[in-house]
Design a protein with these regions (language model features):
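Generic detector of intrinsically disordered, low-complexity, polar/charged segments
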Residues: 4, 8, 59, 137, ...
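Serine-hydrolase catalytic machinery in alpha/beta-hydrolase-like enzymes
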Residues: 23-131
Length: 153
């Protein structure tokens, strides 16, 4: 039985450069709990001076990027669980390969390789974040769920 691939691919960039990979971390969406108030929202760069440390959820977004639903969920997690939430932003790469499903498995694997690199970098870099207390879990949704599930420390 032949599979009909009715999805489509957009974008030309199929591999990270050191600069595009770094941008996924530096521009990550970060939410920190805030006792008595709304969670604090910013980027890794904006929280360089933060002094209070928290356990963290490193959350891998789906193929739609850091969309409004991801932001709401991250803020809820930070507030409800009193954890830092960091969402590396893979959409920082201009003209990055994206898709609408279904496409051949080889095309998904190109994207999964990029996403795996982003998560690996995040797990290295988070150790240097002043708001990180050394405890982390990894989670994700959809395309990001595959990234989280495949992660090997």
């Amino acid at each position: 039985m032949a599979i009909e691939y009715t999805g489509s691919l957009q974008g030309k960039v199929r591999a990270h450069t050191p600069e595009t990979l770094a941008a996924t971390w530096l521009n990550a969406y970060v939410v920190l709990p805030n006792a008595g108030g709304a969670p604090k929202v910013g980027t890794v760069e904006e929280f360089k001076g933060e002094t209070k440390a928290y356990p963290a959820v490193v959350f891998c977004h789906g193929s739609s990027g850091v969309n409004p639903q991801i932001k709401i969920f991250a803020q809820w997690l930070a507030d409800a669980l009193r954890v830092a939430v960091v969402v590396p932003d893979s959409m920082q790469t201009e003209d990055r390969l994206t898709y609408s499903s279904p496409v051949p498995a080889a095309d998904y694997e190109i994207i999964h390789k990029m996403r795996s690199q982003e998560l690996a970098l995040a797990m290295i870099e988070i150790k240097h974040a002043p708001w990180f207390d050394g405890r982390a879990i990894i989670a994700g949704t959809s395309e990001g769920g595959v990234t989280a599930a495949r992660y090997q420390a």
